[in-house]
Each structure stands twice: as structure tokens, then as C-alpha cells.
Amino acid sequence: MRDVLEQCDFLAAVFDMKAHRVSADFAIMTYGDQVFQLHSDGTYHSNPLRGLLPENPPRGAGIEIRLYDTDPEDAVQRAIATGAVILVDPTDKPHGLRKAYILCENGYAWVPSTQL
């Protein structure tokens, strides 16, 4: 993450995630009974993954973080209020989900969805 604190604020505002042990370099986020870890780019100084991060956008390309049982309409409205990019408005899908695609500042696609 470019900015862990900003990402924590985004996830709390849009998805009601709870932040724990927050610092500029690290945070634990909870979403229901799921746990996420956020790390700043700087914490990867000796990690081989660091060499894979592009210096220029796009970042996060190809990853979708799916959050089931999250109302896509509500999440989209909250995301708009944060200035996030809505890639796909809430849409009914033939596989039985209603979902949206929200792009955060760090370039990750967050996909809130509910069953139809």
C-alpha cells in the first residue's frame, strides 16, 4: 500500500471494516470474521515481491477482493463519497449475485456482492 492509514479510512468508510494495530506501515483489518493485513510498500524492502511492484500505475491490476454479503448499492454510495472510482455499478449477474466493482486509490478492485 502506498498509504496504509488512507486505506484503513477507505475500508472503514466503504465496507465498515474495523482497523487494529494501525501504523503508517501496517494494519490488521477485520471484515466480519475475516482478517486482512495491510502493509506499506516500505515494509517490503527485502521481500522479493518488491521487485514486482510497478513504479508507475497501474497498481493492483488483476486482483479482485470479493466481499460477499455486502450491499453493493450501499458500498458504491459510500465509495463515491470517498472519491473512489466505480468501475461497474451494481449489476445482477446470471450466476446469482448482484455486485459492483470499486477501485481504491491503491489500485485494487473491491467487489461487494449479495445473493439475488
Enumerate the predicted regions with their spans.
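Conserved beta-strand-loop-alpha-helix junction that forms the acyl-donor binding cleft
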Residues: 1-3
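Conserved active-site tyrosine of GNAT-family acetyltransferases
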Residues: 7-12, 79, 107
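Vicinal oxygen chelate
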Residues: 17-70, 74-103, 114-116
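Short glycine-/small-residue motifs
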Residues: 109-112
